């Protein structure tokens, strides 16, 4: 989860999120090089007094400052397109979970196990000392580690957005439409997200809590009432 004054991404917990962070680092490296070069050129121009009143054009320099940015954009575009297609990649899922957005809570259905429940934010007066304000819920979504999960996401009223940054998932929940997303969680723990689409007065009070655990604990959770 995100912490106070954090400048980087939250902990990665899926292959697609790892690729997103790698692409971010790749892009930042290129941007940093461009920034340093630009500052150097501006400083160099301001510090010297060399002028040429007879120079009307510079064919070579025009070719250079056209080709180099084009090559730079290619180095950014290729991994970006690769990542874009990876986010829409589908694979054979082992477990399907249906996610339904409401004003202002989430409903989860384990279609393979005939289990469903609603998930509400824990009000501040009922919070424990180790709870996180505006993030903890009364019923957490639980999934097993290293398992292909398919999320079927929709809404019962207005447009919501089911988002868990650590998994690299952000999918709109649209009434009358069933969107899908896939993920594999590689680390156990409790991960948080929030609705990322303004959906009314209590938009800020419909968090998402996802617990990633072992298959044994997941089966115990499914069998619990």
Curated annotation (Swiss-Prot):
Q: Which residues bind Cu cation A2?
A: 195, 197, 199, 203
Q: Which residues lie on this side of the membrane: Mitochondrial intermembrane?
A: 1-26, 83-225
Q: What class of enzyme is it?
A: translocase
Q: Where is it found, in Gene Ontology cellular component terms?
A: mitochondrial inner membrane
Q: Which InterPro entries match?
A: CcO_II, CcO_II-like_C, CcO_II_C, Copper_CuA, Cupredoxin, Cyt_c_oxidase_su2, Cyt_c_oxidase_su2_TM_dom, Cyt_c_oxidase_su2_TM_sf
What is the protein's major site of localization? mitochondrion
Q: Which GO terms describe its molecular function?
A: copper ion binding; cytochrome-c oxidase activity
Alphabetically sorted, this entry's keywords are:
Copper, Electron transport, Magnesium, Membrane, Metal-binding, Mitochondrion, Mitochondrion inner membrane, Respiratory chain, Translocase, Transmembrane, Transmembrane helix, Transport
Q: Which cysteines are joined by disulfide bonds?
A: none
Instruction: State which ranges are Mitochondrial matrix (membrane side).
Output: 49-62
The catalytic activity, as recorded, is: 4 Fe(II)-[cytochrome c] + O2 + 8 H(+)(in) = 4 Fe(III)-[cytochrome c] + 2 H2O + 4 H(+)(out)
* Gene3D superfamilies for the chain: 1.10.287.90, Cupredoxins - blue copper proteins
Q: Which residues form a coiled coil?
A: none
Kindly state the subunit structure of this protein: Component of the cytochrome c oxidase (complex IV, CIV), a multisubunit enzyme composed of a catalytic core of 3 subunits and several supernumerary subunits. The complex exists as a monomer or a dimer and forms supercomplexes (SCs) in the inner mitochondrial membrane with ubiquinol-cytochrome c oxidoreductase (cytochrome b-c1 complex, complex III, CIII).
Family membership:
Belongs to the cytochrome c oxidase subunit 2 family.
What name has this protein been given in UniProt? Cytochrome c oxidase subunit 2
Q: Which organism is it from?
A: Rhipicephalus sanguineus
């Amino acid at each position: 989860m995100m912490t106070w004054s954090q400048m980087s991404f939250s902990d990665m917990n899926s292959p697609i999120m790892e690729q997103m962070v790698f692409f971010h680092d790749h892009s930042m490296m290129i941007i940093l090089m461009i920034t340093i070069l630009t500052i150097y050129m501006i400083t160099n121009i301001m510090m010297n007094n060399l002028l040429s009143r007879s120079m009307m054009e510079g064919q070579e320099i025009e070719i250079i400052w056209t080709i180099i940015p084009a090559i730079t954009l290619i180095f950014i575009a290729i991994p970006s397109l690769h990542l874009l297609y990876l986010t829409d990649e589908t694979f054979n899922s082992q477990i399907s979970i249906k996610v339904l957005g409401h004003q202002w809570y989430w409903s989860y259905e384990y279609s393979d196990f005939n289990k469903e429940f609603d998930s509400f934010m824990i009000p501040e007066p009922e919070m424990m000392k180790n709870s996180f304000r505006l993030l903890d819920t009364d019923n957490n979504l639980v999934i097993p580690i290293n398992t292909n999960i398919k999320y079927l996401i929709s809404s019962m009223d207005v447009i919501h957005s089911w988002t868990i940054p650590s998994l690299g998932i952000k999918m709109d929940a649209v009434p009358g439409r069933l969107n899908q997303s896939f993920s594999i969680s590689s680390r156990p723990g409790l991960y948080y997200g929030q609705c990322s689409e303004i959906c009314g007065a209590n938009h800020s009070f419909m968090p998402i809590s996802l617990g990633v655990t072992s298959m044994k604990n997941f089966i115990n959770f499914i069998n619990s009432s």
